[in-house]
């Protein structure tokens, strides 16, 4: 316990509180059990430590990492028992997916220690409703993704810009601060700005995130063999070189020597882990149940990291739009254009010379153009979709 406390103190000292992710003020910190899920490298640990540092008494709090060597000889329930007996009130467990019986033991801690507030973070691959120890009725769950363009501007350039809604974008109600050049940093954001890494070789860091996700997180959750994990990496490479594409599961399965159904499962794991995005057909408003129409890499920064020289700017634009909108609202494939949001707003994404041919006589149709600073009528600048959170 002493070593855990010492590690906790060191992490608190090293935690900066000058910038907060969008999720920081959306979490109901009063809930008895909170789960924060998200891909690797998007700032979950920092967010938790910031909350402790700014809002909680140190003596009442304990932060631990589930992969700490302490848990080689101690159980999570033992730690909670000891912490509660010492008067502890707030227990934070980072990377819970690295602890084997995490769901069962969190349930026991919740049921036996009503005096404790528990927060855990984990890979977005996890499904808390899966299995015998369903936490979905106990934990208030949140999912966080990488930096928006708005957050990138604040973190790396000190430019503060309020978040806006989709309605404000469509109504052209987004005010540009005096002197702000919206395109000045946009290309850099697309290439390297989705993950909050500031020092060193950004591309190397992102490759490490991808490798750890594929080699550790997904196999651990899905109980995959080493051979299947290798095929997962090959599948991601295929997607990186050809996204967006209409998936032919049988053809891909033949390349990887995996059944069609298994390919669909592997794609689902990659999607949950924040490595790809699957654009589906509409199913009467039930998001996530439609047929997969196109597969994208999750975000533009992944494209520049994984696709090498095969970077198509049109793909980058569509990927950015899909990534920034789908975490906030239902996004499906449009039968006449690129994307359909909320089942009623049609969006065509392209460069500044993009025409409106496909949207003629279409109600609620919008053209999203790159390389323009301001919008008019039904034309919206692409960069503004980075202001949604």
Give the positions of each predicted feature:
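N-terminal pre-Walker A segment at the start of P-loop NTPase domains
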Residues: 1-26
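Conserved lysine of the Walker
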Residues: 44-45
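Conserved catalytic cores of phosphodiester-cleaving nucleases, focusing on short active-site segments
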Residues: 321, 325, 339-355
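Short glycine-rich substrate-engagement loop in P-loop NTPases that contacts/grips substrate
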Residues: 58-90
């Amino acid at each position: 316990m002493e070593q855990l406390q010492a590690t906790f103190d060191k992490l608190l000292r090293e935690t900066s509180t000058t910038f907060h992710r969008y999720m920081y003020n959306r979490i109901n910190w009063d809930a008895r059990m909170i789960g924060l899920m998200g891909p690797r490298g998007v700032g979950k640990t920092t967010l938790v430590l910031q909350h402790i540092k700014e809002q909680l008494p140190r003596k009442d709090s304990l932060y631990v990492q589930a992969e700490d060597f302490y848990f080689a000889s101690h159980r999570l329930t033992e730690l909670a028992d000891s912490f509660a007996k010492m008067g502890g009130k707030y227990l934070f467990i980072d990377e819970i997916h690295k602890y084997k019986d995490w769901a069962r033991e969190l349930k026991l801690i919740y049921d036996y220690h009503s005096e404790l507030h528990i927060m855990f973070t984990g890979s977005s691959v996890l499904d808390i409703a899966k299995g015998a120890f369903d936490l979905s009725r106990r934990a208030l769950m949140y999912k966080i993704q990488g930096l928006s363009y708005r957050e990138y501007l604040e973190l790396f350039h000190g430019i503060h810009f309020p978040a806006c809604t989709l309605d404000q974008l469509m109504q052209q109600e987004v005010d540009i601060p005096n002197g702000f050049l919206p395109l000045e940093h946009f290309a850099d954001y697309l290439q390297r700005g989705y993950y909050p890494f500031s020092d060193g070789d950004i591309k190397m860091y992102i490759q490490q995130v991808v490798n750890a996700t594929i080699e550790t997180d997904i196999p651990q959750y899905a109980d995959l063999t080493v051979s299947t994990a290798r095929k997962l990496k090959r599948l991601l490479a295929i997607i990186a070189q050809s996204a967006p594409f209409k998936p032919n599961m049988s053809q891909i399965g033949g390349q990887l020597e995996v059944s069609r159904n298994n390919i669909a499962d592997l794609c689902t794991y990659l999607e949950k882990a924040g490595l790809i995005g699957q654009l589906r057909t509409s199913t009467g408003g039930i998001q996530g149940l439609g047929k997969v129409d196109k597969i994208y890499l999750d975000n533009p920064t992944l494209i520049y990291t994984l696709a090498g020289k095969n970077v198509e700017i049109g793909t980058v634009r569509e990927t950015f739009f899909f990534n920034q909108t789908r975490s906030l609202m239902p996004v499906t494939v449009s039968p006449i254009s690129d994307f359909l949001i909320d089942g009623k707003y049609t969006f065509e994404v392209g460069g500044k010379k993009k025409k409106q041919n496909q949207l003629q006589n279409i109600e609620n149709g919008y053209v999203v153009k790159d390389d323009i600073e301001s919008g008019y009528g039904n034309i919206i600048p692409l960069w503004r979709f980075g202001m949604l959170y």
